[in-house]
Amino acid sequence: MKRFLSLFLSLILVVLFTVSFSQEIPTKIYNPKIQKVSQPLYVAIIWHNHQPLYYDPDQNINILPWVRMHAIKDYYDMAYILKNYPQVKANFNMVPSLLYQLELYTKKGIKDKYLILAEKPAEELTLEDKEFILRRFFDVNWDRIIKKFPRYWELLNKRGQSIDDVVIAKAIQNFTVQDFRDLQVWFNLAWFDPDFQEHDKELANLIKKGRNFTEEDKKLVIKKQYEIMSKIIPLYVELQKNKQIEVTTTHSFTLLCLFL
């Protein structure tokens, strides 16, 4: 993500520089008396960050984990990368339903079902817990992410690349307590942006370790997730105050801002 965004921003700067300083271009093919006068090219960079409202007030939990997962994968890192290019301005569409759920995690102590089961000690998992984990803790791109991590890929193949009831029932019997604990860790560890995986020493050490994780390892991964989530809103506020970004928003999801 960092390499892609850096390359994209560099390309924008090159285009702006080239267009701004280009000479007048004659258009003799159409009319030798008419010349095109080059004008600055104005480019609006808009990052659309949204999440539906997953919060269920009846259960007092977030039903799905995608606010948390994209927080550690995209929302912080994209703004942090932009901060390193102060001459580049951008717009971020941060919908209130996303900001609200970030605060549910960081200030209200609300969790999602995936997080609750990830935090649960592996030896205490029920059959229902194990079934859910085996079905849902591989919900990340298999080719680009899971395959990068040998143990995670091993666990996927041990489960089977299907969520058929027969396959899951067999996997429940075949998975050891350690297998379930490693899966709990890997699902949460693999979602981190590669910058965190490479440059955060504690996360890098866990990735290097690869298997036989402990409950303490799992707690560390979750702690890191909360640290990142708690920094997201302050970072965007800082960039907005410095006039490097503008924030556009609607409550939940919109395409209108992309058309303006």
Predicted regions and their residues:
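Sec-dependent signal peptide cleavage junction
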Residues: 18-29
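N-terminal regions that are enriched for targeting/export leaders
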Residues: 30-90, 97-220, 241
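Short, glycine/serine-rich, charged loops/turns that create anion-binding
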Residues: 12, 50, 252
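Bacterial N-terminal signal peptides
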Residues: 8-16
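Structured, charged N-terminal subsegments at the starts of enzyme catalytic cores
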Residues: 223-254
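Alpha-helical scaffold elements lining the catalytic groove of polysaccharide deacetylases
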Residues: 256-260
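Short, well-ordered beta-to-alpha junction loops that form the rim of enzyme active sites
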Residues: 94-97, 251-253
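Positively charged n-region of N-terminal signal peptides that target proteins for export
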Residues: 1-4
